[in-house]
Regions:
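Conserved acidic residues
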Residues: 47, 98, 198, 260, ...
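A general structural detector for well-ordered alpha-helical segments in enzyme core domains, enriched
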Residues: 1, 33-34, 60, 64, ...
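A structural motif corresponding to the C-terminal lobe/cap of the Radical SAM core domain
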Residues: 211, 224-231, 238-243, 247-409
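Radical SAM enzyme core and accessory elements
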Residues: 13, 35-45, 383-516
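Acidic, low-complexity intrinsically disordered segments
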Residues: 1-187, 191-195
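Glycine-rich, histidine-containing beta strand-loop boundary motifs that form or position
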Residues: 20, 53, 81, 103-104, ...
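Short acidic (Asp/Glu) and glycine-rich catalytic loops that position anionic groups and cofactors
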Residues: 165-168, 195-200, 354-362, 393-396, ...
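Radical SAM [4Fe-4S] cluster-binding motif and immediate context
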Residues: 139-295
Length: 516
């Protein structure tokens, strides 16, 4: 949208509309809205709809295009985005569309639209996207509406590309990283901030690659915090974990709680796996930097691990999970390997007997080291981990779930055992209410693990009330006495109340790190 005038024409920009949908919107409603926006075509007039196609919307977009073409056969459909930029000819969505731009579309999409409208007509269906110098790309931020700024997390980019070659990632295909000129970019951020934007998510693959630029961006937001209207500022960056120079640490340490969030891809601590997938990561430095961030900064850490990588076993993944958990980040995202189109991870398919779903999101279903049942078992555990650990609803109770039941056990296996039991009792990973989860945790800790009922109930009570839920789990059905502004059981023992108060105080002091 932002480049339709610069690389097309002023007239083209004026004739272009940007329409966004959610996956929840019925497809017939999307068709009606799109065709209504275009209006009835005049004789000889070309009408164009472009779609950004991703792993998460390709199925719905394929069906949407089929409906559009059935209702208006002369419509020109142009595709772009990562899902159609690789293995292009094999895809149904490509076969039913008119043109595909692979790679960058900032310049190529306006040029293609101008050709379709004014001629000469393009000869090729698949068009390799032109990658211009970044100073030839118009930044899009002026097109953000006031509604966007007031209600949305804003995606911004200070750079594109990535110099690293992790084989599961599409960015591994980039030759390097390219940075936008910093002064104009910061001016755009200032304008957005003055218009009321407070939630910024940087989509740069490696924010802390160029430290001088990182420092200036962090300083920009730090300066905003001195202004009277800085309430609600939240800034999210994706960082590599083993590159945190003192210059960067000094600024990070100045941020107050609730402002800075880092997404930190660990993926695996297994050095053999790291080499197989061309991932360069200093594990010792990674751990040291994570520990520094937790102890010396107020940054919220969202860390990632990937299950199913070639060469990874269940036991080796468990070791990596326990190592990361012991460091204490606020979140650990447990992902499943996906074979994204075009990624070099495909080169391991035969040697490691990798079997993937043939439908999006193309998750791995079996490897030489992980059978199908183990993959299913872990997938369930990952969903329960989100519901219990990453949700923040069980801050006091989670350490009990993670505490090894024996010296031969570990936190990973403790939670896996809970996940196995929860699956056996419910046979579902979706639709579990907060109350059902509270009762499941209570039963596991008191019946399976044999922990003291009153101590477990006190923890769950505090967790449940703090979560803001207002129903009544069975294990807390009688809790009615006042406790710190809330209510507990009138028949609760003094020991229960004292334990709950003590645990709440401990929670306030130590925050919500996953390892308690």
């Amino acid at each position: 949208m932002a480049n339709m005038a610069r690389h097309g024409s002023t007239d083209l920009a004026g004739r272009t509309s940007l329409i966004e949908f959610t996956l929840a919107k019925p497809l017939p409603d999307m068709v009606s809205q799109l065709l209504s926006t275009l209006g009835e075509p005049l004789r000889g007039q070309v009408q164009i709809i472009g779609f950004g196609v991703y792993i998460w919307n390709v199925v719905q977009t394929t069906e949407l295009i089929r409906l559009l073409k059935a209702q208006r056969p002369g419509l020109k459909i142009v595709l772009g985005g990562p899902e159609v930029s690789h293995e292009t000819d094999q895809q149904e969505i490509v076969q039913i569309s008119d043109h595909v731009i692979t790679g960058w579309g900032d310049v190529s999409f306006p040029k293609l639209c101008k050709q379709l409208l004014d001629g000469p007509q393009p000869l090729m269906k698949v068009i390799q996207g032109e990658q211009p110098p970044l100073d030839q790309i118009e930044l899009p931020y002026q097109h953000f509406s006031d509604t966007d700024l007031a209600n949305r997390l804003l995606y911004v980019e200070a750079s594109r590309g990535c110099p690293f070659k992790c084989e599961f990632c599409l960015s591994s295909l980039d030759k390097t990283a390219w940075a936008f000129e910093l002064a104009p970019f910061l001016n755009e951020l200032q304008t957005l901030y003055q218009r009321g934007a407070r939630n910024f998510k940087f989509v740069d693959r490696t924010f802390n690659l160029k430290i001088e630029a990182s420092v200036q961006i962090l300083q920009f937001f730090l300066n905003r915090l001195t202004e009277p209207d800085a309430d609600g500022l939240l800034v999210h960056f994706e960082v590599i974990p083993d590159h945190l120079p003192d210059k960067l640490k000094a600024l990070i340490a100045l941020y107050p709680p609730g402002v800075l969030q880092f997404e930190v891809g660990i993926q695996s601590f297994n050095e053999t796996v790291q080499k197989l997938i061309s991932r360069r990561q200093d594990n010792v430095q990674t751990e040291a930097n994570l520990r520094w961030l937790i102890s010396e900064s107020n940054a919220h850490l969202h860390t990632d691990l990937i299950f199913g990588l070639p060469g990874e076993t269940l036991d080796s993944f468990a070791e990596g999970f326990d190592r990361l958990l012991a460091i204490g980040p606020q979140e650990i995202q447990l992902g499943i390997l996906k074979r994204l189109r075009g990624t070099p991870i495909a080169r391991h398919t035969e040697a490691f007997e990798m079997i993937y779903d043939d439908q999006p999101p193309y998750v791995v279903r079996q490897t030489k080291d992980l059978d199908a049942e183990t993959l299913q078992r872990f997938t369930r555990m990952a969903k329960y981990w989100d519901l219990v650990a990453n949700s923040g609803r069980f801050k006091l109770s989670l350490p009990f779930l993670l505490k090894p039941a024996s010296p031969q056990n570990s936190s990973f296996w403790s939670f896996m055992n809970f996940a196995d039991e929860l699956w056996q009792r419910t046979s579902k990973t979706y639709g579990l209410t907060p109350e059902a989860l509270v009762d499941a945790v209570f039963m596991h800790l008191t019946e399976t693990r044999g922990l003291p009922v009153e101590e477990v109930r006190a923890c769950l009570l505090q967790d449940y009330v703090a979560s803001g839920a207002r129903a009544r789990p069975m294990c807390l059905a009688q809790e009615r006495l006042p406790l710190g502004g809330h209510v507990v059981n009138p028949n609760a023992t003094d020991a229960t109340i004292a334990t709950a108060q003590k645990l709440r105080g401990r929670q306030d002091r130590h925050g919500s790190n996953l390892n308690g």
